[in-house]
Amino acid sequence: MGYKEYDEYGTRLLEYDDNNNLIHSKEKCGFEAWYEYDDRGNQIYIKDSDGVEHWREFYNSGKLKSEHYKDSKEEYWYEYDENGKTLKGKFMYFPKKLHQAIITY
């Protein structure tokens, strides 16, 4: 069933699942974040009230396999091998007045 508690300062409400994984936080200022985990307890998704999203996928060993990050200013994707070396990456930057910049390696 999980549980809820306030942080040590009383400014943020934290909600946990049955495995003690943080699944939701809400600050007094209104900022919120939601978290998801895979079967092994790895944090695989984060979304917040500012529009930031971050996805992650892990190897069975627990090492990071890929990640995707997106907010209003940039977006990137990376893939890694089992040793943590970057295999593929793509970064997009969204400047306000310029055209979109894409960097792939």
Name each model feature, range by range.
Residues 5-7, 26-28, 69:
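Sterically constrained small-residue positions within well-ordered secondary structures
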